[in-house]
């Protein structure tokens, strides 16, 4: 998480960190990112001045900052893909609060959408987030309320444990 738009230049310049995270993802390390972390896992970030900064490129989305709040509110989310926090069909609750938005149409053709979201206040349904092809990387704007779905936290710890065990065998 955090505010990558405030540090986009420094994040882009830290090539060794970008490469290390991308390599860890390719090697199957479980990576779970919410909001700012989701932005960092994407292809690029367009800031308030329309400057474009490359991010890790692990997930297909490109995001742009907006002066107006893009989303705030509680949502229910259903996992659409098996991934590091659970199986397809798992229901989670949480909230979204962000000034950035995915650039429309980018990523949708090649990406594996992570969630089907339902806004609690008006029942609007929309897709969100992405899961990597291997299922080890999950990113979205959703801030999960893990007390409402302990199974997701347990699954993520299990994914991390299994990854650690697999690394010991090498």
Model-assigned labels for residue ranges:
Residues 1-3, 37, 135-138:
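Short acidic (Asp/Glu) and glycine-rich catalytic loops that position anionic groups and cofactors
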Residues 3-4, 148:
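Extended, subdomain-level signal for the structured scaffold at the beginning of enzyme domains
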Residues 4-85, 156:
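Cysteine-nucleophile active-site neighborhood
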Residues 64-170:
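Amide-donor transfer/coupling interface in amidating biosynthetic enzymes
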């Amino acid at each position: 998480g955090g505010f990558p738009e405030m540090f986009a230049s420094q994040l882009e310049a830290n090539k060794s960190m970008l490469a290390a995270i991308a390599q860890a993802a390719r090697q199957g390390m479980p990576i779970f990112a919410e909001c700012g972390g989701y932005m960092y896992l994407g292809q690029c970030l367009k800031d308030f001045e329309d400057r474009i900064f490359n991010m890790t490129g692990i997930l297909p989305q490109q995001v742009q900052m907006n002066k107006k709040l893009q989303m705030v509110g509680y949502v229910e989310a259903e996992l659409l893909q098996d991934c590091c926090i659970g199986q397809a069909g798992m229901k989670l609750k949480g909230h979204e609060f962000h000034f950035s938005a995915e650039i429309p149409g980018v990523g949708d053709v090649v990406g594996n959408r992570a969630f089907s979201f339902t806004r609690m206040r008006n029942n609007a349904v929309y897709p969100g987030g992405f899961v990597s092809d291997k299922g080890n990387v999950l990113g979205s704007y959703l801030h999960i309320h893990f007390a409402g779905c302990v199974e997701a936290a347990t699954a993520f710890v299990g994914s991390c444990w299994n990854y650690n065990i697999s690394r010991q065998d090498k």
